[in-house]
Each structure stands twice: as structure tokens, then as C-alpha cells.
Design a protein with these regions (language model features):
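Beta-propeller folds
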Residues: 1-186
């Protein structure tokens, strides 16, 4: 196959009439090599000599209700990592909120990919998202100021679908908690 294309992302500040580029070189793990490279000693040595930033794509940028903060959903093009990063809108710098790594493939219900991820804001400081950090797709929240992350669901099942109430107090979810082939609404 062909080599994947690369993408650069920018943010335009209308008030300052300035463009900021997303600086991905400080993302934790941006130079990590996938485990499969160990099976190719020559390639491993070459890549260790010249560690390069992996190519990434910013799939979404979610703004807080008041526009104070933005969370970028960033994925490595090799599909091994997903980072949720808070964007400092004054400098274009990124702060890690959550990192998911999977040597097989980052994916799963509501975690992004071709259908986009399930995520949003509970208030101006609290962002919710889905992650397969435990091996199952579950809901989490993170305070974008402190970085404190909390699981909202847990167990040996997947949250298949999620919707947040208008008042942002309740999640309506469908899960396969009783059986992998059954979905139940809560």
C-alpha cells in the first residue's frame, strides 16, 4: 500500500487575527515505537538512532460551553495511541488529559475512528468521553484544569450507545451488560 498522508492542524484566533499551529512534539509517547518493530531488528536500530514524532491526526476539537477550553482528540496514524489533550488557546500548546495505548488497535464503541467518538462537556471544566482503557468501552470524566479523571461506568461489558440529557445531569446508555449479543437501555 501507499504511505499514509500527513496532516497539520492550525487554530485561527479571530480576535488576535493570529494562527497557531498544534505543537505535537510534546505529546507524551509521540516517539514511542510499536511493539511489532522489535521483530525487525534492522528497522528497530534505525528508528532508535533517529527517533521521530509519529504522524497524528486531530479528529475532533471540542469547545467548552463558554469557549474557555478546547479538548483535542488526537490519534496516531499507526492506530496504537489516542490522546485527549487540552489546548491552550493562547499558545497552541497541549496538556495531556488521557492517553490510551493498544498494541493491536485503538477502537471500540464510541472511541472514535470512522464514526467519531462520543464525548462532550458536563460543564465548562468537566469533559466526558469513552475509553477502552480497561478493555471495555466505558464512560469517563476529566477535569480539564486539574487533569483528575473519574470512571463513570465500569465492569465486564461495553457501553454501546450514550446520550446526555439536556440538563447534563443524566446519561442514557445502552450496554451489553447481560450478554454480548443483547443491548439494554438504562
Amino acid at each position: 500500500g501507499s504511505q499514509q498522508g500527513t496532516v497539520e492542524s492550525f487554530l485561527y484566533d479571530r480576535v488576535k487575527d493570529t494562527i497557531y499551529s498544534f505543537k505535537t512534539d510534546s505529546i507524551p509517547g509521540i516517539r514511542d515505537l510499536p511493539d511489532y518493530v522489535k521483530d525487525y531488528p534492522k528497522q528497530l536500530e534505525e528508528r532508535k538512532k533517529k527517533p521521530a514524532n509519529r504522524a497524528v491526526s486531530i479528529s475532533t476539537l471540542n469547545w467548552s460551553p463558554k469557549g474557555t477550553y478546547a479538548v483535542a482528540d488526537i490519534r496516531s496514524n499507526d492506530n496504537k495511541d489516542r490522546w485527549l489533550m487540552r489546548l491552550d488557546t493562547a499558545t497552541g500548546k497541549l496538556m495531556l488529559l488521557d492517553r490510551q495505548r493498544d498494541e493491536a488497535w485503538i477502537g471500540g464503541p464510541g472511541t472514535g475512528g470512522f464514526g467519531g467518538g462520543s464525548a462532550g462537556w458536563l460543564d465548562d471544566n468537566t469533559f466526558w468521553f469513552r475509553s477502552e482503557a480497561t478493555g471495555y468501552s466505558h464512560l469517563y470524566s476529566v477535569n480539564v484544569i486539574t487533569g483528575e479523571k473519574k470512571p463513570l461506568t465500569s465492569g465486564t461489558y461495553e457501553v454501546q450507545q450514550v446520550s446526555l440529557s439536556k440538563d447534563k445531569k443524566y446519561f442514557y446508555i445502552s450496554t451489553n451488560e447481560l450478554h454480548p449479543g443483547e443491548q439494554h437501555f438504562y
